[in-house]
Regions:
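Short, charge-patterned binding micro-sites
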Residues: 38-69
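Ordered, amphipathic secondary-structure segments that act as subunit-interaction surfaces
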Residues: 61-116
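Short amphipathic alpha-helices in soluble, non-transmembrane regions
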Residues: 78-86, 126-138, 205-206
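A contiguous pocket-lining binding segment that forms or flanks enzyme active sites
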Residues: 117-153
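Core RNA-modification/binding signature centered on pseudouridine synthases
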Residues: 138-254
Length: 254
């Protein structure tokens, strides 16, 4: 059976890169005594795949890993086993069974992701910058420079910026694990295209906006938290998008 596990990554774990996070989760499965399926051959490894690697320095309430298991667990049992053995900053939120097959893996389904950007004290946008941003995201065309292994490429990110809202209400600011949560107005919510098709990072949106205003990007100004990751079940026709959280594609195990 294949299980999709949803977990949060907070606190100091935001400084851990993707490969180290993979090793961390493998050790967690071993410590928890979960009966994981291993590949065959000379170098057996756990059969598991990660949906959408998180950038270093970001926190998340929506990390996903698909794991093949040799025996059945209830969702509650598996979540409890993992949380009892989890390191500080990692908290398992849910576990659900998903169909086998390459087409059902989380990494092949990712199409959209939500983020909250929380400004550090003293770096908040004033009302004039907020209004400028609201006008900027409404443009029909927004050119940004995307960097990849093949070099730099100018792309229009406007069609892939699904939503951009400056919060009028206080929201939680994700900080170090032993700090008390802060609440502050002015957080920025972004919903962006994600995955292997067209992946738009929230820091690319911010850097492009700042550069368009003739200023230098300042990554220290804000903290980024990934709120949710979605699959698109709507098909390829224009206007037919139907986004569903990856965990929503699974079945609760009794």
């Amino acid at each position: 059976m294949r299980v999709r596990i949803k977990y949060s990554k907070q606190g100091l774990l935001k400084f851990i890169g993707h490969l180290d996070m993979m090793r961390c989760f493998q050790k967690l499965l071993r410590r928890a005594g979960v009966d994981v399926t291993f590949s065959e051959g000379y170098s057996p490894h756990m059969v598991m795949s990660y949906a959408f690697p998180l950038g270093v320095g970001m926190t998340s309430d929506s990390e996903y890993v698909d794991v093949d298991l040799n025996r059945a667990y209830s969702s509650r049992e598996l979540v409890s086993l993992l949380n009892e053995a989890a390191p500080e900053g990692l908290h398992v939120l849910d576990a659900r069974e998903v169909p086998l097959g390459k087409g059902n893996k989380g990494m092949t389904l990712v199409a959209r992701a939500d983020y909250t950007l929380s400004f550090r004290p003293g770096y908040e946008w004033d009302s004039s910058v907020q209004e400028a941003f609201r006008s900027w995201v409404k443009q029909p065309v927004i050119y940004a420079v995307k960097k990849s292994k093949k070099g730099e490429k100018e792309v229009d990110i406007a069609p892939f910026l699904y939503e951009a809202v400056i919060s009028p209400e206080p929201k939680r600011v994700c900080g170090i694990a032993d700090e008390e949560p802060e609440f502050r107005k002015g957080d920025l919510f972004l919903s962006l295209s994600a995955g292997s098709g067209t992946n738009i990072r929230p820091d690319l949106v911010m850097d492009t906006f700042v550069k368009d205003r003739g200023l230098l990007p300042d990554p220290y100004r804000f903290m980024i938290n990934r709120d949710e990751v979605y699959a698109d079940l709507g098909g390829e026709r224009p206007g037919s998008d139907r986004f569903v959280p990856l965990i929503g594609l699974g079945t609760t195990m009794e």
